[in-house]
């Protein structure tokens, strides 16, 4: 696959009902909320064509509405709590796109890039990671910390795996 053929969709899950730290994705770090850091990270990519923020929060919706070309999808309550984030991605592709009549995105998507807002200190450029993913012909890639422990800051998956619900649920 050539880079010109890439249509990456960034999905930023930004729930505010975290059990350990309430509204953590709305916390301000270096003058911006964690949600804003995640959106800006996605917007800096030349390979990401669509950005979707999903949340149950009107506060998150208000932040998203200040950005051009960023979609807000209200997260279904059954996808809250300690649900695997992979289930959120699959739900967006299998249900929410259909319900919103957004057929263009899932039809065009080649890759899904999950960006967790609670990691604002990313040092790798998103495009470099996507290019690495493609060059090495991976199906699924998740970031790790300096000790090699998965941190889920960014996860890249072939869109077909998300569309069909075949992506691993226990990564990232």
PLM segments and residue spans:
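Short phosphate-binding loop-to-helix
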Residues: 52, 58-113, 121-122, 128
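Conserved core of the sugar-phosphate nucleotidyltransferase
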Residues: 107-111, 116-172
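Short, hydrophobic beta-strand segments that form beta-sheet elements in well-ordered domains
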Residues: 51-55, 140-143
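Short glycine-enriched, charge-decorated loop/helix-capping segments at active-site entrances
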Residues: 24-29, 78-79
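Hydrophobic targeting segments
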Residues: 7-12, 35, 50-53
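Local beta-strand N-terminus motif with an aromatic residue
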Residues: 6-8, 48, 108-109, 138
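N-terminal nucleotide-binding beta1-loop-alpha1 segment
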Residues: 1-22
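A short, N-terminal amphipathic alpha-helix
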Residues: 34-50, 62
